[in-house]
Amino acid sequence: MRTDTSSDSSQSIWSAIRSHASPPLHALHALHASEVEIRGWLIPLDPTEPAADYFLLAADEPCCGGCIPRDPLSCIEVMMATPIAGGSEPVRLRGRLMQLVDDPAGWRYRLEAAERVQESSGSPLSAPGMSRRAFLASGAALGLAACTPGRFERYTDARDAPNPDDSAPTQWRASPGALTIDMHSHAGHVIVSRNPSLGAHRPLTPVSAPMRAGGMNVICLAIVTDTVVTRVSADRKRFEAWRSPEPGELYQLSQTEFARAKELVAREQLVVVTSADGLASAGQSGPCVIIAAEGADFLEGQLERVDEAYSQHQLRHLQLTHYRVNELGDIQTEAPVHGGLTDFGAQVVRRCNTLGIVVDVAHGTYDLVARAASVTTKPLVLSHTALAGHPGARSRLITADQARAVAQTGGVIGVWPSSGTFHDLDAMAHGFRRMADVVGVEHVGLGTDMYGFISPPVFRSYEQLPSLAAALLAAGFSQHETAQMLGGNYRRVFEASLT
């Protein structure tokens, strides 16, 4: 077996990838989303095709043409701008290097928009080859993911920490008694994996340490109860429902997910907040969580299950819909079926108001949000999104009118760190500014959707919280306004909902 040693820079990238499990990986963190050149062996996923725009690049020469590495740290997933032909010699590629999280195919790194750098005569072919879509659809990806689930010990900051010697704005200083709160998080990989070979056995990951390191006091820890019937779409741009659940299936999934949340709380020594008084003391209690559910699919049309989740599982934050049109209403990413919030959905909103559960309308259509706003007696939240002037069809972004509908209840809209919306934390901070210009600072919050994205977001660890706060100050927000958006506003809604 031959090993590529012709390029020091290429070799350093391969070395860093191989040492992935031994943080800190400063070299790779600095390279995330940047253009790199790397040399390796092209491994087509279908050796019979003359050219491919999706393949693996390995550091070492494979033993045979059909040998696909099972170690995700020995290769990089490649998406070419133009299909290229394989060969018996290594190739040099230039593209954008990305770290992946829980990738459906199990890979840890991807080279995007890649182009071949010619080292000898020859030119890329334009014949179509096997695409990633075809590979994922073939089912081969599932077997690979079973061997090597995508999992990171931690993410790191893509934004450099503020330098005291720079002329950057003063760092944010939390006032006594202030709380930082993430309105929407799947921290610790709390949700059951969509990979059936992992399922509920998906390893839990650290939560307390990154929260302490970044100064995050409270997270709304959200289970998800539609994962067994949803999947990543073929174009990898969204999740979609692919089958109807069996009776009782999503309720049973919720029991598994609530149990995982309980296990994570115990393992990480987290404090579960269930009351306004409990939230008030959260700053002195160490890392805290508010138990949440993303999608009320587990109710399966049975209102009494709201009470059960409240009493047995300490549920205090309920998002009505997620990635399937359920009994409560319509979602942004599918064609409308109900015309907005259903009558059952309205009953759930009223029951949450009575019990003391925050109602979250994220993922819901404008019509769902509008009716929920007319029904509720407590402030609503829309926990994770961003503002768009004219959202595309099936977009998760919202219009100004949708944001105002939430704000008019006294509620809060959480700005999320999607890399499809914002290219860095500075851009995300300006997303906060645009939202605040529409609804007012008092109605804007933070919803990281931690570990909930298909592609790595611009906020990937709670250790980045000081950097986000600095970006908000640089965007023109005051210390007090920053404190409001990073927790104070959600605190107001939580206290109002539970009293």
Residue positions per predicted region:
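Short, conserved, surface-exposed binding loops centered on an aromatic residue
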Residues: 29-30, 46-49, 371-374, 403-407, ...
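Sec/Tat-exported extracytoplasmic proteins
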Residues: 46, 101, 265, 356, ...
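Short acidic/polar capping segments at secondary-structure boundaries
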Residues: 97-98, 116-117, 294-297, 322-325, ...
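N-terminal hydrophobic targeting/anchoring segments and the immediately downstream early-domain regions
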Residues: 126-142, 148-337, 392-446, 450-499
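Active-site core of metal-dependent hydrolases
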Residues: 321-401, 414-421
